């Protein structure tokens, strides 16, 4: 019975996909309006289901996902790739420089991937964390 309950909780946690935005969404989940891409393990925006006609398009959440509310002004032009540091790309989703995703990395890392000085993940596993005992 306990094994069945654990399996059920594990399955629901993966399917629900609700929680903080960012890499590792299979474990952490995704914010409302987005879904977990199991190939890249990153949250992606769900399509907007809205019958409103908005001349300037829909507003976006802080994560860059559109929701059913009209923009009052036209959207700013996207950033230019030349504005982004090396190793980053211009995201049409957020209009900001964002980390490139290495879709060829097939490593399964229990402690996650290492990050470079810009905070972008690269295809190398983080070492196991050393636990330091607390002094009471």
Swiss-Prot record:
Residues where heparin binds: 114-117, 128-135
GO biological process entries: negative regulation of coagulation
Record PTM Pyrrolidone carboxylic acid, positions in chain: 18
InterPro entries per the UniProt record, alphabetical: Antistasin-like, Hirudin/antistatin, Prot_inh_I15_antistasin_leech
Disulfide bonds: 25-36, 30-43, 45-65, 50-68, 54-70, 79-90, 84-97, 99-120, 105-123, 109-125
Keywords associated with the record: Disulfide bond, Heparin-binding, Protease inhibitor, Pyrrolidone carboxylic acid, Repeat, Secreted, Serine protease inhibitor, Signal
GO terms, molecular function: heparin binding; serine-type endopeptidase inhibitor activity
Antistasin-like domain residues: 45-70, 100-125
Domain of life according to the entry: Eukaryota
Stretch forming the signal peptide: 1-17
GO cellular component: extracellular region
Record localization: Secreted
Record site feature (Reactive bond), residues: 51-52, 106-107
Pfam families cross-referenced by the UniProt entry: Antistasin (PF02822)
Function: This highly disulfide-bonded protein is a potent inhibitor of factor Xa. May have therapeutic utility as an anticoagulant. Also exhibits a strong metastatic activity.
Descriptive protein name: Antistasin
């Amino acid at each position: 019975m306990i094994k069945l309950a654990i399996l059920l909780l594990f399955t629901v946690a993966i399917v629900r996909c609700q929680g903080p935005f960012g890499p590792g969404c299979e474990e952490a989940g995704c914010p409302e309006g987005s879904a977990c891409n199991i190939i890249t393990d990153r949250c992606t925006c769900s399509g907007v289901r809205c019958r409103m006609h908005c001349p300037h398009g829909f507003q976006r959440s802080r994560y860059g996902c559109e929701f059913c509310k009209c923009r009052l002004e036209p959207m700013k032009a996207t950033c230019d790739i030349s504005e982004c540091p090396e190793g980053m790309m211009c995201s049409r989703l957020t209009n900001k420089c964002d980390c490139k995703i290495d879709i060829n990395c097939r490593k399964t890392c229990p402690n996650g991937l290492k990050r470079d000085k810009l905070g972008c993940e690269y295809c190398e596993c983080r070492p196991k964390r050393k636990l330091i005992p607390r002094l009471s």
